[in-house]
Amino acid sequence: MMPRNWKSVLSIAITSLLTSAGMPRLAVAQTRVSIGVTETMETYNPYGDSVALLYDLYSEVTGPFCSYNFATGEYEGRLAQRWEIKDPNTWVFYLDKRYTFNDGSPVTSADVVHSMSRVLAPDSKHTTLASPMLKAEAVDKYTVKLITKNPTAPLLDFICDRFIITSKAAYEKYGAADADRYHMLGGGPYARKEMVPGQRIVLVKRPDHHEAKKNPQAPDEIVFRPMREPEQRVTALLNNEIQIAQFIPPHLRKRVEASPHHKVVAADSLELMFLAMQPKPPFDKKEVRQAVCYAIDRDKIIATLLEGFATRLDGPIGPGQYGYDPNLQPRYGYNPQKAKQLLSQAGYPNGVDVELQTPVGRYTLDKQITEAMVPMLNAVGIRTRLATPEWPTLWANVQAGKVPFYYMGRGQVLDPSPPLHQYFRTGVTPRIGYSNPKVDEILFKEQEEFDPAKRKKYLAQAMSLITEEAPACFMWRHKLLWGISDKVDYQPPPDAGIFGLHIKVRR
C-alpha cells in the first residue's frame, strides 16, 4: 500500500531522461498522479491509432489545434488562436505564437502542413479527420489554410481535439519511426517522458508553458496505467496505487464509496454504445439486422446490470447532442415476437447461427452486458456464440472490417456528422462496411450545409434512414463513474477525456 506521504515518496528526477529527446531541462517533479485506464496505445506513431486515449494524450503533448469548451458550449482556440471561413472549401487558421515545441522551436504553419500530410497518408488511422480534407497550405509562418474536398460545415468537430500537430523538423531529421519513438516534440503543456505500449505512458509537465501556468496544482507527472479489469482498477485505487480510476462499473461503486479517502464521481457520457453488423450473411438482410434490434431488451439491461446509470438511445444520438430529434422514427422497442417474424421473412424460419465479439474491460460491463444479450438473441432464433478476443486483436480486426457482429462504442460525439460519415458513408472506413447511395447523398448535403436549421433537417433524415436500415443497433450512453482519491480534485468532462491541466493535486 502506498504511504500517506505519497507526494514526497513519489518525487522523481526527470532531467536526464528528457535531455535525450531534445527536451529542455526541467525541474524535479514534486507530484505524480497515476490513472488506471481501460485502453492503451499499441504504437508510437500518433497517427497510427485512433483510440480515445490517443487523442487525450496528444492533446496534452502536442497541444490540440483547437478545443471544445463544455462550460461555454463553444469551440475555442489553442494552437490555432482563431479562424475564419474564406469560402465553403477554405478555412484559414491563425496560429498562436506563444506555442513552442519542447526543444524551444516555434510551432509554425509548416508543421501543420506536415501533420496534415501524415493524417492523409495511406498508413494513417485518422480516417475520420482525413475524410473531408484535401490538403493544408501555408500562407505565412503563422497562417495556414485547411482546404476541404467539399464544403464541410462541421469541420471544427473533425479537427478540434483531434488534429495532432507534430514537428516537421524532427520528422525530417530522424525519420518517422525514430521521431515518433525517441524525439516526440510537441507544443502542449506536457511532454511524453516514457511510453511502453500496452504497459504505461508517462507525461511530464512543462512548467514554463503558458497553459501550465493556468493551473499551478496540475500534476508534475501523469502515469497512464492500462487496467482492463474493473476490479483491478478499484483495488489499485483503494490501495493508493492510482489516484484516478476510469469507468467504475455500478456494482463496484459501493466499495469505493465505503472508503473515507475516496469518492465516486459521475459524468454524463457522449459515447454511443451499439451493436454493429457487417452486411455479410446473415446480416446482409435488413430484416435480420432489425430482428437483432427488436431482440435486445435495453431497458432491462439498463435497469439491472447498469443500475440505471445509462440513457437509452432510440437512434444514433441522444439528448444534448447536436441535431437530436426526440421524435426520430423508427424505434425498436423490445419485441421478441416481431424479431422472430423478421427472421422468418429474411429466409431463416429455423433460426441462424452467429458470433458476437465483445471487448472485455474496455467499456462498462461490456462482457456482462453481451452475456445478457446472448439469451435474448437465442430466444428469437439468432443462436449466438460470444467471443472475447484481446482488445488489440479485436480493435485491429474491427478497423480492417473483419468482424461481422460486435459490441462497441464511439466516443466524444458532440456533432453526429463525424461518426455518421465514419461508420455509415460508403468507403470512409471498413468498420461496418455499410453502403447506401441515399444515405451518402444526404450525408454529403448535411456536411455542405452551413445553415444550422437546414443542416439539422438533413441530419434527421440521415439518422432516420440509418436507424431504419439498422447496420447498427443503438443501445445507450453510459453515465460513467470514476473513482477519485482525496489527494486530487477532478471532474471528468462529458467526453470522458483525461487531461492533466484539469486535475488539481491537493497540497
Segments (PLM) and residue ranges:
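Ligand-site clamp/hinge motif
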Residues: 208-255, 375, 383
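Long beta-strand-rich cores associated with HINT superfamily self-processing modules
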Residues: 482-507
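Gly/Pro-rich hinge or "lid" segments in bacterial periplasmic/extracellular proteins
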Residues: 69-74, 161-217, 221-223, 229-231, ...
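Structural transition elements
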Residues: 312-345, 363-367
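Extracytoplasmic/peripheral linker and loop segments enriched in polar/acidic and small residues
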Residues: 379-394, 421-486, 507
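Ligand/substrate-recognition segments at binding pockets and active sites
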Residues: 197, 344-412, 452, 480
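N-terminal lobe/hinge region of extracytoplasmic solute-binding protein
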Residues: 36-87, 94, 117, 185
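Surface-exposed binding/hinge segments that line
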Residues: 25, 84, 128-172, 194
